[in-house]
C-alpha cells in the first residue's frame, strides 16, 4: 500500500512537472531502486510532532522540510506573519519554461490523544499488512529488502498531509537523477495551520502576494 500510494502520487507529480513520457519510466526506476530510502525518509518526517499549536515543533518541521528542498536546488524561505506558523515557500526556476506550477500542501497535523493509539502517534511503525486485518509490526527495510506494496506505515499525518511532501521530493529526485529535468517553473506553498482552521492563511497571502503572482 505504501509503495502503491507513493508511486501513484509520483506518477501524477512527475507527469505534471515534466510532462514527458520518459518521466514515468524514470519514476518507476527511482521507486524500484530507492523504495527502502523513501520509506525511511518518510518515517523520519513522520516522527516529528506537527500539531499546529506546538510552535517549537512546527518550526522544527518547517526548517527540516525547507532544507530538504534546498538540497535539491530550490530557493527556499520561511514566510513569517505575526502570531502565525511559517509558510514554507520555495521556487525552482526552469530556463525557458512558459508556465509556473504552485503546489499547496499543509505540514501540520490534527491534535492527537496518545491513549487512543496502539503506538505513539509520532513513532512510525511499519506493518506487513493492515493492522485491523492481522498485520504485524516489521523493521524498516534495508537496501536489499524487497518492498511489499501491502505494507502499511502507521503514524499521525502519514496520509494527511505529509505524504504529498515526500511524494514531491521523490518526484524531484527521480527527474533529477534521470537528467530529464522540469518543463515548468515550480513554486511551493506549504501551510502550517490548516488543521487549526487556516486562520492566518489570508494574512500570509496578503503579505506575500508578490511571491504568488
State where each predicted segment sits.
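Intrinsically disordered and other compositionally biased segments
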Residues: 12-15, 54, 161
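Intrinsically disordered, low-complexity segments enriched in polar/charged small residues
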Residues: 8-9, 111, 161
Amino acid at each position: 500500500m505504501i509503495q502503491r500510494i507513493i508511486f501513484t502520487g509520483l506518477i501524477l507529480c512527475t507527469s505534471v512537472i515534466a510532462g514527458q513520457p520518459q518521466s514515468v519510466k524514470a519514476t518507476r526506476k527511482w521507486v524500484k531502486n530507492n523504495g527502502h530510502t523513501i520509506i525511511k525518509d518518510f518515517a523520519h518526517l513522520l516522527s516529528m510532532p506537527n500539531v499546529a499549536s506546538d510552535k517549537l515543533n512546527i518550526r522544527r518541521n518547517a526548517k527540516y522540510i525547507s532544507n530538504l528542498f534546498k538540497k535539491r536546488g530550490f530557493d527556499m524561505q520561511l514566510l513569517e506573519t505575526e502570531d502565525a506558523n511559517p509558510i514554507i515557500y520555495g521556487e525552482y526556476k526552469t530556463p525557458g519554461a512558459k508556465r509556473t506550477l504552485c503546489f499547496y500542501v499543509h505540514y501540520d497535523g490534527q491534535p492527537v490523544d496518545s491513549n487512543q493509539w496502539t503506538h505513539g502517534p509520532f513513532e512510525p511503525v511499519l506493518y506487513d499488512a493492515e493492522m485491523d486485518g492481522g498485520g504485524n509490526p516489521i523493521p524498516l527495510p534495508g537496501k536489499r529488502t524487497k518492498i511489499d506494496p501491502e505494507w502499511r506505515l502507521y503514524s499521525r499525518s502519514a496520509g494527511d498531509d505529509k505524504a504529498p511532501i515526500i511524494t514531491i521530493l521523490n518526484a524531484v529526485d527521480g527527474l533529477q537523477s534521470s537528467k530529464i529535468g522540469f518543463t515548468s517553473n515550480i513554486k511551493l506553498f506549504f501551510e502550517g495551520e490548516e488543521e487549526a482552521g487556516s486562520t492566518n492563511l489570508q494574512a500570509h497571502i496578503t503579505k506575500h502576494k508578490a511571491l504568488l503572482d
